[in-house]
């Protein structure tokens, strides 16, 4: 009987110490991303060093959104992709030092691929660029350099501008 009491006196403190350690080991630390959107990286080529760039997103059924507001001397930037639509339509407004603005509409066609990291985190959408079209007021051409849009910060689209006149 005396041995049972001694055993229980030692078991209870040991259990109180071991229980939190076991509970912490059972819990997983999950760092979910704050946003579920990934971005398309645009790199500008040509004579845009002195220009100012504004980019608007045209969303059917809603108001336009300013994504980039008066970026001075643009060389590259990242714009988040929509994850519900099969295309994103952007309006590029390039203003030179004399105040002349040239506007182009760029349409990016893509697939939306859900990407799951953990059941505790919301799905992210990766994208595959399939086609890009543009008007040609300031933009000469757009080339898909890397079609897969994911966590990597690589240049996905290369935008070539007409030379200044």
Per-range role (PLM):
Residues 1-27:
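Sec-dependent bacterial lipoprotein signal peptides
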Residues 2, 42, 161-165:
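Signal peptide-directed secreted proteins
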Residues 21-45:
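Bacterial Sec signal peptide processing site at the extreme N-terminus
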Residues 27-32, 78-165:
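Extracytoplasmic cysteine-anchoring/structural motifs
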Residues 36, 71-75, 86:
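Ser/Thr- and Asn-enriched, surface-exposed coil loops between beta-strands
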Residues 39, 50-54, 87-89:
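Exposed beta-strand and adjacent loop surfaces of beta-rich binding modules
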Residues 44-46, 57-61, 94-99:
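Short acidic, glycine-rich loop/turn motifs
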Residues 48-78:
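Post-signal-peptide N-terminal segment of Sec-exported extracytoplasmic proteins
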């Amino acid at each position: 009987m005396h041995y049972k009491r001694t055993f229980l006196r030692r078991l209870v403190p040991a259990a109180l110490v071991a229980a939190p350690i076991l509970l912490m080991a059972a819990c997983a630390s999950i760092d979910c991303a704050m946003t579920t959107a990934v971005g398309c990286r645009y790199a500008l080529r040509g004579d845009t060093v002195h220009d100012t760039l504004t980019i608007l997103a045209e969303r059917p059924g809603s108001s336009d959104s300013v994504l980039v507001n008066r970026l001075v001397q643009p060389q590259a930037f990242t714009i988040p992709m929509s994850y519900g639509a099969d295309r994103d339509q952007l309006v590029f407004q390039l203003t030179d030092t004399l105040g002349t603005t040239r506007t182009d509409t760029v349409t990016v066609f893509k697939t939306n691929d859900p990407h799951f990291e953990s059941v505790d985190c919301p799905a992210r959408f990766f994208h595959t660029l399939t086609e890009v079209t543009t008007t040609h007021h300031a933009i000469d051409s757009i080339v898909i350099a890397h079609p897969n849009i994911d966590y990597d910060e690589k240049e996905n689209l290369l935008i070539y501008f007409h030379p200044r006149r």
